[in-house]
Amino acid sequence: MCSGPKSNLCSSRTLTEIESRQKEEETMLLLEFAACDDLDSFKREVEEKGLDLDESGLWYCRRVGSKKMGLEERTPLMVAAMYGSIKVLTFIVSTGKSDVNRACGEERVTPLHCAVAGCSVNMIEVINVLLDASALVNSVDANGNQPLDVFVRVSRFVASPRRKAVELLLRGGGVGGLIDEAVEEEIKIVSKYPADASLPDINEGVYGSDEFRMYSFKVKPCSRAYSHDWTECAFVHPGENARRRDPRKYPYTCVPCPEFRKGSCPKGDSCEYAHGVFESWLHPAQYKTRLCKDETGCARKVCFFAHKREEMRPVNASTGSAVAQSPFSSLEMMPGLSPLAYSSGVSTPPVSPMANGVPSSPRNGGSWQNRVNTLTPPALQLNGGSRLKSTLSARDIDMEMEMELRLRGFGNNVEETFGSYVSSPSRNSQMGQNMNQHYPSSPVRQPPSQHGFESSAAAAVAVMKARSTAFAKRSLSFKPATQAAPQSNLSDWGSPNGKLEWGMKGEELNKMRRSVSFGIHGNNNNNAARDYRDEPDVSWVNSLVKDSTVVSERSFGMNERVRIMSWAEQMYREKEQTVV
């Protein structure tokens, strides 16, 4: 007797487990047919076996609003809405045996949540069918998200016309005509790649910024090693037609290349024109300089135009291209520091002591006018030379100006002091001719030395040397008339070795001192030469080549003038003693 009841109990439990497993298998079969949109098989299972259309089962899928995969509780209506099975969905709704607002599973999602989370091709039609069946657009899941909130997270996988239509549908507005228009105008692109959630949105974040679009979009190579949709990737791939050259590396313009339109350009990457639509419209000179005709309703995946007037980039009125934003743009507000000043092609020629072949003598009347015309410092040339050389040249102008003024004043004082000693007009003219021979005819402009001085200083030394030599020869005019004049030797007027010298050595300076002493009584003078090492120093000539910025050491001050006057007075005394 005990065995009987126990046997009946075991058999009932076994029957219940078998029936439940069979029921789960039948439900799983319905879910499979709903996902594949196999209406005939789905109807056969429902009509012949009498399966419940509102029965839920476990379905392996992605959780709504998450990237995690797992077994979730779903009804055939939810699966049909998720995969866009419009035939099965319409059949289920037409029977009226399934609740369109039923929430099941741990997520407590509805068929409308599943429809927007699936992002299927027929998503708009599925949502429209559910809304016609009185589906609630404000229903919330376990996380408090409405269908519209779920769609915002996955909208980057939807094209713009469909996205706008879905948003209007989920907001509950009267959008019947707008939905039909959006569906008709939608450009359906058949892609062999499924939607990849790992790809970043090319219109969001840094990928949608103007800086990335102009200089990095379809320029940098993609680092993904697997096959994916190139149209959804912001980087360039081997063999892609949307490839662009880096505008910072290749100086091309936004003007389309006529040779590239014909098929291929022989210049390749070195061409100065844009190759393709992307290079032309994404060029920094043209990107977002015009307003898009569709504005915020633009359906382009990558748009080259601004959707708002605030997004438009400024355009240069003279060139018609966009104004480049660079760190040097702030210099335009500062006078004298504008980048245009550095790019000037007009430069001042180097200042030379010989302007147009005329020696820069203090007696030259046009010297001052030539100097006034070159007072303006030359423009800095970044292309031809360095800034340091240009700066030194500009500084040397002021130094040469002051040097010439000093030379003019000194020359007048010497002539006033010794002008009365010249008694022979013929010898004066001969002396003037010989002095002109010592002027450099065509001095070569030397580059600045390590001290920053140029050949103009050397020319000044040569001029002073010639004057000193000519002044020494004036002693011949003081020879007594009873004695025969010595034969003039023109070679003695030059350097001792017969070569043109630009500097003054110690031996030549000592000879000049002996000639200036007026102790010459002829070529047969046997008097012992005096040692003139104690004579006043004439090294003031070297100061002409020094910088004139420091008054105490580098300028012709009162001390130099007093020394010159004392030297002239001593020569006058020696002359009187010689005559007597």
From Swiss-Prot:
Alphabetized PROSITE patterns for the sequence = ANK_REP_REGION, ANK_REPEAT, ZF_C3H1
What would you give as a GO molecular function for this chain, any one? DNA-binding transcription factor activity
Task: Please give the InterPro entries that the UniProt record associates with this protein.
Answer: Ankyrin_rpt (IPR002110), Ankyrin_rpt-contain_sf (IPR036770), Unkempt-like (IPR045234), Znf_CCCH (IPR000571)
Q: Any transmembrane segments, and where?
A: none
SMART domains, per database record? ANK, ZnF_C3H1
Database matches in SUPFAM superfamilies: Ankyrin repeat
- Which tissues is it found in, per the record? Expressed in roots and anthers.
Where does the record place it? Nucleus
Q: Where are the ANK repeats?
A: 72-102, 107-139
* Induction line: By salt stress.
> Cellular component GO terms, alphabetically?
nucleus
Explain the purpose of this protein: Involved in salt stress response. May positively modulate plant tolerance to salt stress.
User: What protein name does the entry list?
Assistant: Zinc finger CCCH domain-containing protein 47
